[in-house]
């Protein structure tokens, strides 16, 4: 999360990757009859961007969306891996080329790159609450935040199931979004009037319970969890609201024992 004024441009966001060897266990064979399709042994590669702040055009130190799209296309073309493409927030507000359309032009660019999911960052509210809601309509993939509420109801979808191979059971990914409660002070207060940001750890654990209860009722068992956390890392950020604290808390969640979780 960054300040409420136009976002800094000191560090370009580039796609980062993580593989099963470090982050996520390979999918286990489903306990189904022998004739059911089984997942192949593949690495999982997560390409993630965050805090791009409207950097659509390539310049020194900035990859730009054209080259970003090429990287995504090249990774998805690799048949020996499963590729997820996600964004951890603050994608739209920042540079004039994006601000001129209130970020809507860049939202459409992300659609062209076919992202799998995105978390809500504090700067997604910089053009007002109505515009933040509008992003949900423009984007063709889920915009996630499990801890953003209006009138006691979640404003955004809390989680999504990403299934890269619908013919294979057991290789789905549960993606959960969470937004920094600092949003209340890191965008203009008028932009989040009536919006409540609840505790990240409590809310993510609640979503895990919700997802697993629904999965059990449907006879499913999701083994991979990815948390897109737009949380602060500064010393001024309360410890309970930091991404590192969330990662530590999830590692102790008994519901996730024997599973793998990646916090981005």
Regions found by a protein language model. Name each.
Residues 34-264:
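Acidic, metal/ion-coordinating pockets
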């Amino acid at each position: 999360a960054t300040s409420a004024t136009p976002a800094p441009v000191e560090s370009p966001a580039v796609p980062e990757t993580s593989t099963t060897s470090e982050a996520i266990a390979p999918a286990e064979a489903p306990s189904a009859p022998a004739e059911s399709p089984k997942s192949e042994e593949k690495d999982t590669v997560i390409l993630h961007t965050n805090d791009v702040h409207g950097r659509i055009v390539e310049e020194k130190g900035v990859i730009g969306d054209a080259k970003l799209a090429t990287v995504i296309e090249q990774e998805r073309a690799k048949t020996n891996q499963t590729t997820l493409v996600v964004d951890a927030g603050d994608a739209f507000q920042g540079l004039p080329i994006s601000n001129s359309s209130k970020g809507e032009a860049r939202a459409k660019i992300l659609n062209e790159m076919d992202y799998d999911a995105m978390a809500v960052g504090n700067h997604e509210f910089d053009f007002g609450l109505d515009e933040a809601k509008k992003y949900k309509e423009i984007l063709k993939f889920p915009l996630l935040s499990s801890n953003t509420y209006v009138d006691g109801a979640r404003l955004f979808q809390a989680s999504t199931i990403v299934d890269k191979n619908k013919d294979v059971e057991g290789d789905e990914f549960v993606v959960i979004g969470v937004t920094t409660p600092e949003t209340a002070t890191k965008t203009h207060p008028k932009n989040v009037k009536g919006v409540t940001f609840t505790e990240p750890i409590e809310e993510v654990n609640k979503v895990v319970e919700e997802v697993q209860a629904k999965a059990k009722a449907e006879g499913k068992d999701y083994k991979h969890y990815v948390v897109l956390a737009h949380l602060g890392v500064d010393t001024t950020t309360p410890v309970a609201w930091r991404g590192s604290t969330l990662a530590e808390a999830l590692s102790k969640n008994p519901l996730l024992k024997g599973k793998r979780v990646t916090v981005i």
